[in-house]
Curated annotation (Swiss-Prot):
Presence of the UniProt keyword Zinc in the record: no
UniProt keywords, alphabetically: Amino-acid biosynthesis, Aromatic amino acid biosynthesis, Decarboxylase, Lyase, Tryptophan biosynthesis
Biological or metabolic pathway of the protein: Amino-acid biosynthesis; L-tryptophan biosynthesis; L-tryptophan from chorismate: step 4/5
Catalysed reactions, as listed in the record: 1-(2-carboxyphenylamino)-1-deoxy-D-ribulose 5-phosphate + H(+) = (1S,2R)-1-C-(indol-3-yl)glycerol 3-phosphate + CO2 + H2O
EC number: 4.1.1.48
Signal peptide feature range: none
HAMAP family per the UniProt record, alphabetical: IGPS_B
Gene Ontology molecular function terms on file: indole-3-glycerol-phosphate synthase activity; phosphoribosylanthranilate isomerase activity
Pfam families: IGPS
Domain of life where this protein originates: Bacteria
Protein name per the record: Indole-3-glycerol phosphate synthase
Amino acid sequence: MTDILNKILTAKAQEVAAQKAAVNAEHIRALAAEAAPVRSFIGSIRGKHRLNLPAVIAEIKKASPSKGLIRPDFRPAEIARAYENAGAACLSVLTDEPYFQGSPEYLKQAREAVSLPVLRKDFIIDEYQVYQARAWGADAVLLIAAALEQEQLERFEAVAHELGMTVLLELHDESELEKCRNLTTPLWGVNNRNLRTFEVSLDQTLSLLPALEGKTVVTESGITGKADVEFMQSRGVHTFLIGETFMRADNIEAEVGKLF
């Protein structure tokens, strides 16, 4: 595990402890049970595939540790509507505050503005956060293999599925495959950003494709335009998580539209 990931996870453990003190586990489970009905995240992706279109998971991200502030003019509901109008399949919303300037309020605002399913993009280290995600209205959660042990991955996936949510499993390299062998989610993402160097290469996804046969593979990071989309589609990858390229655009709707 890298130094930056270690720092993030240490801070996250403190954050979750404080959240549990404010809203106990029993209460967060009750809130999750009362949340608005789940929208099918994987269903929306498959719907695009049936139309022979790339399925774009469009990200709402204000900042990142590597790039700092990405979009000063940050209006989550407006961004969500632009994504929906442009043909995105789903949304991904950052809820991590210390490193990504995210917020659960951004997720709620985005989901209320559109009919698309929404992923909570965060560092999930406790099943409490899975219930919390559903309570906030999320339809899917991200589980990062590099951040979790096998037992945690399996338990958190089971909780998410019990709540009707989709799990997006995120891999970085082949060394993480073994601990994920029992997971049943159909949605497997490959982050093209090297956790050690922060360099981005689409080869990360390509190198893992043989091991992910039969999965719906999501390529994450490094997709900058239609040429990248067409290249990955030629290799059998039809689902794309894209954030920074859209967030830096003056006209987000037009930028997304360029991919189709």
